[in-house]
């Protein structure tokens, strides 16, 4: 019985190796993903409403409005009664400052906003707008005529006439041998 078990286990191993099958081992399966949390207005009652609180005062939110975060981390110290367009520290990021700034290179454009990198204007090269895309001419192949050599004849008499013409041109006449 012991020999049979050893023989059968070796046979199973050889069979699995010969058939190139891999036995699927249990692997790590990630935990199921949680659905997104959708909160209702009842759950967000204690948190500040950032955009409109009923007083209709046009001001930007600041960290002082937040109940948990301390107001000391607001190191920029923005005025809450003023709305800022882009950046307070760098006025070059604002489009209004670009319009009023003086460019060193005049590119000849009507609006200086279009020339952020002093690029060339190519409108004078292509006045019509879009250029037509060149396309190759249509491919119309010429028909090829093959001389079939009168392969398809209507009557058998045509073959006899051709054979008679062949004999006249290429065969030796009989009267030469009769002398």
UniProtKB/Swiss-Prot annotation:
Predominant cellular place of this UniProt entry's protein: secreted
Gene Ontology biological process terms in this record: defense response to bacterium; innate immune response
Tissue specificity as recorded in UniProt: Hemolymph. Produced in fat body.
Post-translational modifications reported in the UniProt record: O-glycosylation is important for the antibacterial activity of lebocin, O-linked glycan structure is a disaccharide (Gal-GalNAc) in case of lebocin 1 and a monosaccharide (GalNAc) in case of lebocin 2.
Coiled coil: none
Propeptide, chain numbering: 17-120, 153-179
Inducers of expression: By bacterial infection.
Signal peptide: 1-16
Disulfide bonding pattern of the chain: none
Region (Disordered): 93-116
Record's keyword terms, sorted: Antibiotic, Antimicrobial, Glycoprotein, Immunity, Innate immunity, Secreted, Signal
Function: Antibacterial peptide.
Family as reported in the entry's similarity comment: Belongs to the lebocin family.
Protein name: Lebocin-1/2
């Amino acid at each position: 019985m012991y020999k049979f078990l050893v023989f059968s286990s070796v046979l199973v191993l050889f069979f699995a190796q010969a058939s190139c099958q891999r036995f699927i081992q249990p692997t790590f399966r990630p935990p199921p993903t949680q659905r997104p949390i959708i909160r209702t207005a009842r759950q967000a009652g204690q948190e500040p409403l950032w955009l409109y609180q009923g007083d209709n005062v046009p001001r930007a939110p600041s960290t002082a409005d937040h109940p948990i975060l301390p107001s000391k981390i607001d190191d920029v110290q923005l005025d809450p009664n003023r709305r800022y367009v882009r950046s307070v520290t760098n006025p070059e990021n604002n489009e209004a400052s670009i319009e009023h700034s003086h460019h060193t290179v005049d590119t000849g454009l009507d609006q200086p906003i279009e020339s952020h990198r002093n690029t060339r204007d190519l409108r004078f090269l292509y006045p019509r707008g879009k250029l037509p895309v060149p396309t190759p001419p249509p491919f119309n192949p010429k028909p090829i005529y093959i001389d079939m050599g009168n392969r398809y004849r209507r009557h058998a008499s045509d073959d006899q006439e051709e054979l008679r013409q062949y004999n006249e041109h290429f065969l030796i006449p009989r009267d030469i041998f009769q002398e």
